[in-house]
Amino acid sequence: MNISNIKIMLLGSGELGKEFIIAAQRLGIHTIAVDRYKNAPAMQVAHESYVIDMLNSDALEQLILAKNPTYIVPEIEAINTDSLVKLEAHNFNIIPCAKATKLTMDRQGIRALAVQQLNLQTSKFAFANSEQEYLDVIQSIGLPFVIKPVMSSSGKGQSIVKEHNEIKKAWDYAQNGSRGHAKGVIVEQFIDFDYEITLLTVRHKDGTSFCDPIGHIQKDGDYRFSWQPHTMPDTALAKSQEIAKEITDALGGYGVFGVELFIKGDEVFFNEVSPRPHDTGMVTLISQNINEFELHLRAIVGLPIPDIQTLQPSASAAILLEGDTANASICGIDKALADANVDIRIFSKKEIHGKRRMGVVLAKAQNTHIALETSKQALAHIHLTK
């Protein structure tokens, strides 16, 4: 196989895209990073970069036609997916495929596939496209419930509502956190689950492979900590893999899919799926023989996917910092790296207004509990320069 002539265009250039671009660069693949703002993380390591509104069909199609990439790899949901469907019909290779990108760009599309077509078990849910509809569906869902924008990323706009006086605030928060032009929400019955996992599922030319389950903690709908492997009963793991294969087969295409699942005893509830590497999967940068970004690349270009191994129990901690500056400077990295079992990725985002994920701490240990505590101790050293 000759991969030297491959050209990959990444649509969305955040921190996950940056690691994907690095994986491609290491194999000599030409990379193009695209986003709506200058100097996004992946742009800093790509051969070429372009700033466009990816929701604008004309701008998106003109750039793709001009650059003629071998593979078009979406990294975010805020993309004009109708354009991707159109381009795929003209023999452009959308990853994993235009259908998967379109269905997963909003929660309404993927729930329709999961529940109506595949009959997967989920929490009780309903969609609302106005505040009045939202108030109406609450009557059937009941408290407590989870509200999420139909289109958002990194937990933006998500909240758990436990009291009546939180209902209005949660609606407003969801509207502010919505991406693209969609303003609808999904209201889900809150499941008192035992734990939640991400099952990284790799569809490739030789079949489907699974990474070990990744446990994670979220706050305000956003990932804060993850660890691998997450120990779970064989029955629940088998059900999780069955669900993950079913949903990813229905979506189609090659690449890594982040399948989010709730586990309660031996019951497994489908939550969401992303047709790309997952933020909780950043732990694989230290835990696995082949990390999720390398797996995504290999699956896309047709390279072998050998046995995926968890080398050592590991954990990750998101570096979520708060401030108001256009020139962020991070301190404490030296203290965090004093531990030989700790590594760090800084995403090189300069602007921060409020809270923003600026990096990730990675830690390994003899078990996941110690790895998680080690990541938290290292995280405590890191802060913005005052």
UniProtKB/Swiss-Prot annotation:
This is Formate-dependent phosphoribosylglycinamide formyltransferase. The lineage of its organism: Bacteria, Pseudomonadati, Pseudomonadota, Gammaproteobacteria, Thiotrichales. N(1)-(5-phospho-beta-D-ribosyl)glycinamide binds at E15, L16, E75, D279, K349, R356, R357. Homodimer. Pathway: Purine metabolism; IMP biosynthesis via de novo pathway; N(2)-formyl-N(1)-(5-phospho-D-ribosyl)glycinamide from N(1)-(5-phospho-D-ribosyl)glycinamide (formate route): step 1/1. ATP binds at R107, K148, S153, S154, G155, K156, G157, Q158, E188, Q189, F190, I191, E196. One of its GO terms (cellular component) is cytosol. The gene is purT. PROSITE patterns: ATP_GRASP. It comes from Francisella tularensis subsp. holarctica (strain LVS). One of its GO terms (molecular function) is phosphoribosylglycinamide formyltransferase 2 activity. It catalyses: N(1)-(5-phospho-beta-D-ribosyl)glycinamide + formate + ATP = N(2)-formyl-N(1)-(5-phospho-beta-D-ribosyl)glycinamide + ADP + phosphate + H(+). Pfam families: ATP-grasp, PurT_C, RS_preATP-grasp-like.
